[in-house]
Amino acid sequence: MAKTSLKVKATRHPKYSARAYTRCQICGRPQAVLRKYKICRICFRKLAHEGKIPGMKKASW
């Protein structure tokens, strides 16, 4: 889990656009963040399994 200070820091608008980076809105993880949902792959998978993301279901082929 990320520190609270890092979560707050990520929400602020940076002075230079190159300093901006995505961070998961739920857990604060900086890697593997899905831009469309603004959450990391781990939280995305958890929410999808719980049925909290509409229209999302496990793929099977």
Swiss-Prot record:
InterPro entries linked: Ribosomal_uS14, Ribosomal_uS14_bact, Ribosomal_uS14_sf
Alphabetized GO MF terms: rRNA binding; structural constituent of ribosome; zinc ion binding
GO-annotated cellular components: cytoplasm; small ribosomal subunit
Details of cofactor binding: Binds 1 zinc ion per subunit.
One Pfam family here: Ribosomal_S14
Requisite cofactors: Zn(2+)
BP terms from Gene Ontology: translation
UniProt subunit comment: Part of the 30S ribosomal subunit. Contacts proteins S3 and S10.
Record's protein name: Small ribosomal subunit protein uS14
